[in-house]
Amino acid sequence: GYITSRLKEMQDKFAFVGDVRGPGLAIGVELVKDPVTKEPVDDTTMERLLWRCVQHGLFYQNAHNVIKLKPPLIITMEQAAEAMNILEHCLEEAV
């Protein structure tokens, strides 16, 4: 779907996006320090990213170094695009 394809584009753009995985709208985005070793980013980086996203209106859960996106099943394309734009902008700033 659209969200997964946008996240895969971010994975290609940012070396620290180590993996994008999950079925349907239950998506995990793993952030790493090194794309080869897959060493996780630190908790401070994850916290900084979360707060930047919250400031822009995007809320998500994280489990250590994995962003857990679970948008509602009724999300519109416009809402999905806005969420992905916010996430991409915040990834550029926070990591």
Indicate residue ranges for each PLM-predicted region:
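Conserved N-terminal phosphate-binding loop of PLP-dependent enzymes in the Aspartate aminotransferase
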Residues: G1-V95
